[in-house]
Amino acid sequence: MILSNVKLIELPKISDKRGNLSFLEEFIHIPFKIKRSYWIYDVPGGEIRGGNAYKANEEFIISLSGSFDVLLDDGVNKQVFSLNRSYYGLYVPAGLWRQMVNFSTNSLALVTASTLYDKTDYIFEYEEFKSLFCKKQHGI
């Protein structure tokens, strides 16, 4: 998948004197049915999460608290997305190399996924990722 298919999506934000409320709905705010959710927290300083690509899984990543950067790579181009608001999320289609870095203290990342966990969907080696996706996406 090429980076132009990535989308930073603003979620609804309802505010009143009691605080704020945001939400997401499948096929309305994100373009897939949610099959799995997980969250990342207590990441030690300097650690990297991710470092993989998916053959089929799509994700929507939100910073519920704190901040972190999502580095995306389509095998030719790279782009960094900084997430630091709980009412913005990043849609990441399948076929992109993904890393999450620069976690602030007490950050909390929520990830919704389009597939159930399947280890065979993961690509952990960057060169394998490039050989699978670069030719298909960029004709390289």
For each feature predicted by the language model, list its residue ranges.
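Non-catalytic, conserved peripheral segments adjacent to functional cores
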Residues: 1-88, 105-108, 112, 117-127, ...
